[in-house]
Amino acid sequence: MTQMTVQVVTPDGIKYDHHAKFISVTTPDGEMGILPNHINVIAPLQVHEMKIRRVSEDDRVDWVAINGGIIEIKDNVVTIVADSAERDRDIDVSRAERAKLRAERDIAEAETTHDIDEVRRAKVALRRALNRINVSKK
């Protein structure tokens, strides 16, 4: 069976390193499904979940919360470089919930003061928190 090596790398080190037969990520142009022998690609990634169908007897699926970054696909090696990434099993849900509440509060405050930059920053924080919460439930 043809397979790919999947690595997710952050400034904190390698967060994921396994063999897979299918990967799904989200780019600014939409969802991208990746199978072995995919053409070479470099693309930006959105804050979203990453689905990885591993090469295993039980057809296991792993989920990773990706907070943006870049994907490179070359010679059946998929490398994702991201500011941060967390596997579903590693997500601290209570921390993510607190981050969600904090971002919602920051959005409301920034909108009342018409601080556009702060609204944008808080919306990014909210997307990241919601992404982590959603991935933790997979």
Swiss-Prot record:
The entry's keywords: ATP synthesis, Cell membrane, CF(1), Hydrogen ion transport, Ion transport, Membrane, Transport
Localization per Swiss-Prot or TrEMBL: Cell membrane
Matching Pfam families: ATP-synt_DE (PF00401), ATP-synt_DE_N (PF02823)
Membrane topology: Peripheral membrane protein
Coiled coil: none
GO cellular component terms given for this protein: plasma membrane; proton-transporting ATP synthase complex
Key word Membrane present: yes
Presence of keyword Transmembrane helix: no
GO molecular function annotation: ATP binding; proton-transporting ATP synthase activity, rotational mechanism
Listed InterPro entries: ATP_synth_F1_dsu/esu, ATP_synth_F1_dsu/esu_N, ATP_synth_F1_esu_C, ATPsynth_dsu/esu_N
Membership in a protein family: Belongs to the ATPase epsilon chain family.
Function: Produces ATP from ADP in the presence of a proton gradient across the membrane.
Subunit (UniProt): F-type ATPases have 2 components, CF(1) - the catalytic core - and CF(0) - the membrane proton channel. CF(1) has five subunits: alpha(3), beta(3), gamma(1), delta(1), epsilon(1). CF(0) has three main subunits: a, b and c.
Protein's UniProt name: ATP synthase epsilon chain
Origin species: Streptococcus equi subsp. equi (strain 4047)
